[in-house]
Amino acid sequence: MNKEMNRLKVVLAETKRTNRWLAEQLGKDQATVSKWCTNTSQPSLETLFQIAECLGVTVQELISKNSTKDHE
């Protein structure tokens, strides 16, 4: 069963950012960010807030299939 816990890969594409850029912003290894993007592992709640801030989105947009933009 493929459970997507986050939409990080989609949000990175929407914001025209790369795994490498995000890894640099967070001081994390690029392989770690790649695992988050493929839902192989998940970032901590604290890190989710940091990711949201870096990308200019809400945490909800990172984890919900129905982002707030879909409702506008």
For each predicted feature, which ranges?
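Residues in the helix-turn-helix
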Residues: 21, 32, 61
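Short alpha-helical "recognition helix" segments of helix-turn-helix
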Residues: 22-23, 51
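Recognition helix of helix-turn-helix/homeodomain-like DNA-binding domains
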Residues: 28-43
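DNA major-groove recognition helix of helix-turn-helix/homeodomain DNA-binding modules
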Residues: 46-61
